[in-house]
């Protein structure tokens, strides 16, 4: 997900996306531990998406203060 797309979301939608990505990351880590994960690049993509969302949320929080 690109930063431009994330910025278009509301704060609640961003928090929901972050929650979804965290759940996906948990599942991917579990698959990796059991040797079932085929696309290991997905781990880094999901982590980066979480970081993007957190960064934009903190930017919005600073704007509002």
UniProtKB/Swiss-Prot annotation:
A family per Pfam: Ribosomal_L29
Biological-process GO terms, alphabetical: translation
Keywords assigned: Ribonucleoprotein, Ribosomal protein
GO MF annotation terms: structural constituent of ribosome
Keyword Ribonucleoprotein in record: yes
InterPro entries listed in its UniProt record: Ribosomal_protein_uL29, Ribosomal_uL29, Ribosomal_uL29_CS, Ribosomal_uL29_sf
GO cellular component: cytosolic large ribosomal subunit
Cross-referenced PROSITE patterns: RIBOSOMAL_L29
Domain of life: Bacteria
UniProt similarity note: Belongs to the universal ribosomal protein uL29 family.
Name of the protein this chain belongs to: Large ribosomal subunit protein uL29
Organism (species): Lactobacillus acidophilus (strain ATCC 700396 / NCK56 / N2 / NCFM)
Gene: rpmC
